[in-house]
Amino acid sequence: MKKLFTLLTTAAMLCNMFAVTSFAEKSDKPTSNTAITAVKTAQWRATESDSTTYDLRIHGWSGWETAAYMGFELPENFNAENVGKAELVLDTTSVTNSGTAYLYEADYSAFENGMQYTVAPTYTEKEIMSFTSPSNTGEFKIDVTDYIKSIKDKENVAFRIDVKSQNNNTNWNIGSCTNSG
């Protein structure tokens, strides 16, 4: 008889976390927690005239758009077939308004840790999903189970989060890390 066990794997970069719950067939395996540290975060801002250094800010005001990039290394024994649930867990430190946000697959090799970009690092323009951004500060979870289950033969995963220019001052800040270029 197959017995279910849960392996909670988290990847964290300061206040950002990627949590994967995996299932396996072994009955002698206890529940285990393993931390995987996120290796990089970066910031994109739409205008060169904006010289502000942002802390993973997601903003949709027309002409002043920003997006956050997060990169995670997967463990050597990662197997997408065993994923039961996967969540991107973010710590919202400030927010002006809630709105529709978008999650994209980013090119892990296209951005460096701590950089501020005015030319957006490469990402897949078809969003993985849209979701309503938080309206309050604190922990916020995005279910990325379907995406994580679909990845094959990858050593890392990266995300871009943004809001489309909607003249909506979302001004959503994630975490408290300062990314200086």
Model-based region annotation:
Residues I148-S176:
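Ser/Thr/Pro-rich, low-complexity mucin-like regions
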Residues K2-T10:
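Sec-dependent signal peptide recognition
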Residues F5, C15-F23:
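C-terminal segment of classical bacterial N-terminal signal peptides
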Residues F72, E81-V95:
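A short beta-strand element within beta-rich, extracytoplasmic domains
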Residues T92-V157:
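Beta-strand-rich interaction/scaffold domains
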Residues N79-K85, K152-E155:
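Short, charged, surface-exposed loops that flank catalytic or proteolytic processing sites
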Residues E25-N77, S94, E105-S109, V163-N168, ...:
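Flexible, small-residue-rich N-terminal segments that precede or flank a structured functional core
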